[in-house]
Amino acid sequence: MPVKIPDHLPAAGILESENIFVMSETRAANQDIRPMKVLILNLMPNKIETETQLLRLLGNTPLQVDVDLLRIHDKESKHTSIDHMNTFYRDFEDVRHKNYDGLIITGAPLGQIDFEDVTYWDHIREIIDWSQQHVTSVLFLCWAAHAGLYHLYGLNRKILEQKRSGVFVHRRTCQHFPLLRGFDDEFFAPHSRFAEMDVEEIRQHPQLQLLAESDEAGAYLVLSRNNRNLFVMGHPEYQKSTLNDEYHRDLAQSLNPNVPQNYYRNDDPKADAIARWHSHGSLLVSNWLNYYVYQLTPYDLSDMTAMTPWESQ
């Protein structure tokens, strides 16, 4: 959250140059405060586990967040009871008339399937298109990040020969972005995917900005220049055991998976896993929710044209 300071205080310029969020008394006096309304499109097989992971991160912010859970209405969930889905999830027809401050679209176990061949691809496209007019900011995770870059910006992904699984070191490629406030120069994040985006295509796209990358895992954080879409190529929401669970699941299915890199102590799958990314995941979601949702969204959600442009802040 910002530090409120007197108008024209000399320290303001110094703090802003250090990427510290300060707010003048004049602007603070004109701020309206209400709960943030966030919609989560949960495409992961284990709905309850993913709900818990995302709500854990949203609940670690200073803001009050009201959450709605969204499903693809004609897609049966094989790993979550129909009672749970009917009780807690909404269909798109229930929300298409609404506006939201934020939308999170999760990953999905569809890494080797062409987007156009995904059975519910038309529904995904419809929701993404809807979000550009009805949501202040959209957070795309892993598979959804690739899908969003493909649908909105025409970028194609490359299928990897083997699944990329592990915890990798990343670095910021920019310094003075609100999303990166408080980030270390290098930080860890987990990945679990069968595809990657071309870093140079992202760099050269006029509507996109590459904010963080990894020598081993490639592009990680990509932000649209209108600040509306944030693409996260990894899984900062994962809990400590998730990569281990996926590894043993794939072993049980005789898929001959590689051991997740930099995850187990001494890279020994019989040893304990080491969670190195939780503080990063918490900071990433907190910064997104604060700087790209709360600071930009209109008080009256019925008027999405009243969004505050970044340039005026």
From Swiss-Prot:
Enzyme Commission code: 2.3.1.46
Tree of life domain: Bacteria
One of the record's GO cellular component terms: cytoplasm
Catalytic activity, reaction form: L-homoserine + succinyl-CoA = O-succinyl-L-homoserine + CoA
Pathway(s) it belongs to: Amino-acid biosynthesis; L-methionine biosynthesis via de novo pathway; O-succinyl-L-homoserine from L-homoserine: step 1/1
Function: Transfers a succinyl group from succinyl-CoA to L-homoserine, forming succinyl-L-homoserine.
Gene3D superfamilies in the cross-refs: 3.40.50.880
Entry keyword tRNA-binding: no
Protein name listed in UniProt: Homoserine O-succinyltransferase
One annotated GO molecular function: homoserine O-acetyltransferase activity
Keyword Transferase: yes
NCBIfam families: metA
